A protein has these predicted regions:
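Polytopic transmembrane helical bundles with strong interfacial aromatic enrichment
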Residues: 1-215
Length: 215
């Protein structure tokens, strides 16, 4: 029964995660780019009819991904590797961005709440771009952690109160990226679709290299 529950939650975690990240890419790569060129009537139609429905699936898929992932972490407990820990951290931050920044500001953009739609759109856009930036490193760490050769998917080793240098560098980098999502601005490295995809790929390579080799 315990094994069945684990398999069920792992499948559910993957399924709702696909919905979440798929909609994240839809918003960043398709809808946002379309709205930049759409006629006023078409833009209004998207914001009134399409966006609310898509945002409903988006935010609840994010929350369910988090909940199922939390249960899987509970099962792993001390067996969570450096990759799982960092992947889970990025996933948690991304979920908090969805509910704490993106949805709160998108309610203003789509007219469900009063406020400055331009400023709200900018805040939501920055958080959404940040999630897109973190998405590939998060997916890489979470998906491939169970398939790495023995010796590469290590556990963070604590020595005299400190852990692996690479693990710490990735941890600090993630927190700095999130700090920019909350307090910073849209930099050119994430402003366009091509830029954020490129930056996400580079970040994945850098993060994986730090975790694997700088120990």
């Amino acid at each position: 029964m315990e094994y069945f529950t684990y398999v069920l939650f792992r499948f559910a975690h993957t399924a709702v995660g696909i919905v979440w990240i798929g909609l994240l890419y839809y918003f960043n790569f398709v809808q946002t780019e379309y709205l930049k060129e759409a006629e006023p009537d078409a833009k209004s139609d998207v914001l009134k009819k399409l966006a609310p429905n898509a945002l409903w699936w988006f935010r609840w898929a994010a929350f369910l991904t988090f909940l199922t992932g939390l249960y899987l972490l509970y099962i792993l407990q001390t067996g969570a590797s450096a990759m799982i820990i960092l992947g889970a951290l990025m996933g948690t931050i991304m979920m908090l961005n969805v509910w704490g920044i993106i949805w709160r500001n998108q309610k203003i953009v789509i007219g469900l709440k009063q406020g400055d739609a331009v400023a709200a759109g900018a805040k939501a856009g920055l958080a959404s771009r940040t999630n897109t930036l973190l998405s590939l490193p998060m997916l890489y760490f979470m998906v491939f952690s169970a398939h790495m050769p023995i010796g590469t998917n290590h556990y963070p080793t604590f020595i005299n109160g400190y852990t692996d240098v690479g693990f710490l560098l990735v941890l600090v980098s993630i927190l700095l990226i999130e700090a920019n999502a909350i307090f910073g601005k849209m930099y050119p490295v994430i402003a366009s679709v091509r830029a954020v995809i490129t930056s996400s790929v580079v970040l994945t390579v850098v993060f994986s290299g730090l975790v694997y080799y700088l120990v």
